[in-house]
Amino acid sequence: KNILTLLFVLFGGYSLHAQDTCYGLLRNDTLTIGNNLVERTFLWNGGNIITYRLTDKSNGKSWKNHSLTPDFRVTKDLPQPSNGSLKVVPVKETKIFPAYLKVEVSFSLEKLDIKRVYRIYDDCPAIACDTYLRGTVNSIFGGREVSAADRKNIEFAEDMKSKEVTAVLDQFHFQGQHWHARSVEFSDVTDWHNNLVFEKEIISYRKLGYRGNLLFAFNGEDNCGIFFLKEAPCSSIQLAYQGKDFLTDFGKFTVTGLGITEKDVTPDRWTKTYGCVLGIYGEGELSRLQALRSYQKNIRTYRADRDEMIMMNTWGDRSQDSKVNESFCLKELERAARLGITHFQIDDGWQIGKSPNSVVARGSFKNIWDNKDYWKPDPQKYPRGLHPIVKRGKELGIEIGLWFNPSIQNDFADWQKDAQALISLYREYGIKVFKIDGLTIPSKEAETNLYRLFNKVLEETDEEVIFNLFERSE
């Protein structure tokens, strides 16, 4: 039989390529992707694919999808898809990203081009999907939030058919009436929040929305099920947020909220939405957590000498930036060594520029680059630069890290200057670990520029630099 690898444009054939256990196969009207643990089968539908079946290979359990609509939706209308194509490409491992098989499904809905990129990893019971849009959108994503006071009781059958949120990242519709779920929401900004994880137990029986980045769904008859992981910021700070991330409706589970508006989609470039991961697990809590952890281990290549750390930060004694200087840091390094600290991070105060949190001289995060020396070591505090600190750290087996706050004004328009400042610190002092702080991301353009900053630094440092927060970005 004829098997094409790497690239396939649909005209009634099929494509297969394996990354060890990973595969992508298109035969006639059926697309199948998976590995040795999980398989997801789709109806091709001109490229606007519809999940047909999901299989857990570890226990032989298979679920048929009872929805007849495409997995991804940006409008309530369903125009005929065109230009459907498939690419299957093995992606090599880098210093920070593991190898995976990329299965790229592209199609058009009138003037809108859509690209769904599936990431499949060996020995992982989950498949990730990144979505990109380009062109013109003739609809408004999402709808008006329904007030709780306007909701009717379960006896009102028509109310059970409440309007579905238009924008859908992914969905699966199980058979049966005994489905349960657990949503998990997270909070950031730890200066203000001390309760960081919120879980909600759900008995799915009608269409309701829930907040969170994680949804576990399982059948009450055998406790086996799936999880959806929405790869996005915390719910409270997502872009274009409609108040919910997941919808549950008996056995139907939906991921919603793209993180963009129709105005962010243009004909001249691809715009990425928030990502989504669908994973499967067997019976019990341990199986759920192991499945999730298996995927998380594939987000970044693990290297013990780089990624394991016991970090000490100078901000912790509540003196803010009033104490940090060469003498203080050298003394702290000696104590850190006795405690077994592996990384010593100098927080706000090491630099010439003053932040709004400074007790020495009130500064600002706005117009940082009015002072071209903002991100150089303060000569009053560090007359010899950071060289003595780095040198003593190496002697004690402690790596030095720094605090850094990107220039937030105008959607991170100065990202290139910020990137060069980080690159210069790496080249002069060998600083690899940076705490990125104070981020405010008000728009898709700001998010894009922030990714550009991170990617530029990684490119120029041969992926040696480590940020405390960084998501995969192509």
Task: Describe each model-derived feature in a short phrase.
Residues 123-124, 335-338, 428:
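Alpha-helix termination/capping residues and helix-transition junctions
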Residues 345-474:
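Aromatic- and carboxylate-enriched substrate-binding clefts and catalytic-loop regions
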Residues 2-14:
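Sec-dependent N-terminal signal peptides
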Residues 102-108, 115-118, 123-129, 134, ...:
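Feature activates predominantly on carbohydrate-active enzymes
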Residues 109, 122, 133-137, 314-316, ...:
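Short, flexible loop/turn elements at secondary-structure junctions
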Residues 285-335, 339-343, 347, 352:
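An acidic-aromatic substrate-binding cleft motif
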Residues 37, 131, 268, 312, ...:
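Conserved, mostly hydrophobic/aromatic
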Residues 19-294:
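N-terminal accessory beta-strand-rich subdomains and adjacent acidic, glycine-rich linkers
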